A protein has these predicted regions:
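A short helix->loop->beta-strand "cap" motif at the edges of active sites that frequently abuts
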Residues: 72-77, 166
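Divalent metal-coordination and catalytic microenvironments
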Residues: 8, 28, 43, 48, ...
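Glycine-rich phosphate-binding loop signature in dinucleotide/nucleotide-binding domains
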Residues: 35-39, 119-121, 162-165, 284-286
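His/Asp/Glu-rich metal-coordinating catalytic cores
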Residues: 55, 84-216
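Binuclear metal-dependent phosphoesterase catalytic core
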Residues: 112-124, 129, 222-287
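N-terminal active-site segment of His-dependent metallophosphoesterases
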Residues: 1-68, 72, 361-372, 376
Length: 379
């Protein structure tokens, strides 16, 4: 059985106040073309369908169009809500959508029930697990000892028992320990929201969402597919793709990536104003790309942003890197420290002293300790 694994569409996202909707439609059209030339049996959407819990109407229409196009191709779709989504809004109409074989995770109320597809090798059970927070799981099992994200996921999966003789796929949206993150994702403070990769061992393939870099975590079948587009300049060097997964007989899983080509790339340029405005340097290049330009001039260039946008119309961000800005960064460091939480300060100190980050258990313990100290002071 062959799947397309997608996640983190972030429909409606704005990067540096530039709307990405046209680029998102372009890349979704490209994905549909890939599906036409690389047939699959189902599509997995591993959360963060939207960029905000209350998405703009244009983003809702875009997702509606994409799901309709998948349904027109008679492809079952298995989708979950992510941390950027409203689980209630994503689940709206899910019973009706299921009649068209668009299966959407419900608002979390207990362990997921399998949805079964069948091929020549037998049944494949698919489990849809929306983004989880500890409070959601404590609401279902109030007597369970749940203090962390890891405890929460462990509790849920302890109540989920896929048949070991059958192939099983889990679609989930969590931060798995050992994975690499980037700045466009919501920050993880001291690893407090990490979950252990070993919790997923009972599944043949785990289609993960949440992190924007395509990667495996430990075993090859525990995988983030990454975003289809670059959503921050920390992703500028990444090569975006979609992930095709083929489950043959039990224990046989083949994974392949197909590259995606964006309408506009997201890149970084660096140089002096004279270098970047020299026709010989920019002619024949993709000047319409989304750009972060760093000027190395020692003096500010008057109206540099407006003047550079004559050549580079999609210039998103402009910075300077010179002796003056380097000195300013040193002076700004104490101010940035004032904006950090006590846990973030301790996590930085721990990293400096031990050359490794806090574990999620340590971070959870520290947070409890900090809260108890603050309560004592308030009392």
């Amino acid at each position: 059985m062959r799947f397309l694994h997608l996640s983190d569409l972030h429909l409606g996202k704005r990067v540096c106040e530039f709307s990405m909707l046209d680029d998102q439609r372009y890349i979704l059209e490209q994905i549909l073309s890939l599906l036409d030339s690389h047939p699959v049996d189902a599509v997995l959407l591993a959360g963060d369908l939207y960029d905000k819990p209350v998405p703009p109407a244009e983003a809702v229409r875009l997702l509606d169009w994409f799901l309709t196009e998948l349904s027109r191709r008679e492809l079952p779709v298995f989708a979950i809500s992510g941390n950027h989504d409203s689980a209630d809004r994503v689940a709206f109409g899910s019973a009706l959508l299921a009649e068209s074989r668009v299966y959407v995770s419900p608002v979390f109320s207990g362990p997921p029930e399998p949805i079964t597809l069948t091929d020549a090798h037998g049944p494949v059970d698919l489990y849809l697990l929306p983004f989880l927070k500890p409070v959601m799981v404590r609401h279902v099992w109030p007597d369970a000892p749940i203090e962390s994200y890891n405890d929460a996921l462990s509790c849920v999966l302890d109540h989920c028992s896929p048949d070991p003789a059958r192939r099983s796929v889990l679609v989930a949206h969590q931060f798995v320990a050992g994975a690499a993150s980037c700045e466009s994702e919501e920050p993880s403070v001291g690893g407090i929201d990490w979950v252990d990769a070993a919790l997923f061992d009972k599944f043949d393939y785990v289609a993960l969402g949440h992190l924007h870099s395509p990667q495996k975590v430990g075993r090859n079948t525990l995988r983030y597919c990454g975003t289809p587009l670059k959503y921050s300049f920390s992703e500028a060097s990444q090569h975006k793709s979609v992930t095709f997964v083929e489950l043959d007989e039990k224990g046989s899983v083949t994974i392949a990536a197909e590259p995606l080509v964006p309408r506009h790339d997201l890149r970084e340029l660096r140089g002096s104003y004279m270098e970047l405005t020299d026709r010989r340097n920019y002619e024949g290049t993709a000047v319409d790309d989304y750009l972060h330009i760093t000027l190395t001039d020692e003096q500010d260039i008057p109206e540099a942003l407006a003047r550079l946008r004559v050549i580079y119309p999609n210039l998103m961000r402009l910075d300077y890197d010179n002796r003056r800005t380097q000195t300013r960064q040193e002076l700004d460091a104490p101010a940035k420290a004032e904006q950090k939480t006590p846990l973030e300060h301790f996590a930085d100190f721990y990293q400096l002293q031990n050359n490794q980050p806090l574990t999620h258990e340590q971070a959870a313990f520290c947070q409890q300790l900090i809260e108890s100290i603050w309560k004592e002071e308030d009392a």
